[in-house]
Design a protein with these regions (language model features):
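Acidic, polar-rich N-terminal leader regions of halophilic archaeal proteins
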Residues: 1-65
Length: 65
């Protein structure tokens, strides 16, 4: 399953990598990509939306599903 979440606060490539790594650590995530220009992240897998949002927020960014 593919889902997209909104991520605010990414300003550079390092930010994108940080969000991708945080999302990849969530159980059920097969892959994750972040895009600062669209302020979003796309996740492949069966992870829970609340867990995805929490992982991004724990990494220091605002997120919503």
């Amino acid at each position: 399953m593919t889902r997209t979440i909104t991520v605010e606060g990414m300003t550079c490539e390092h930010c994108e990598q940080t969000v991708e790594e945080a999302l990849s650590d969530v159980g059920g995530v097969e892959s994750a990509t972040a895009d600062r220009e669209s302020e979003s992240a796309t996740v492949e897998g069966d992870a829970d939306d609340d867990e995805l949002v929490a992982a991004v927020e724990d990494a220091g960014y605002e997120a919503s599903a």
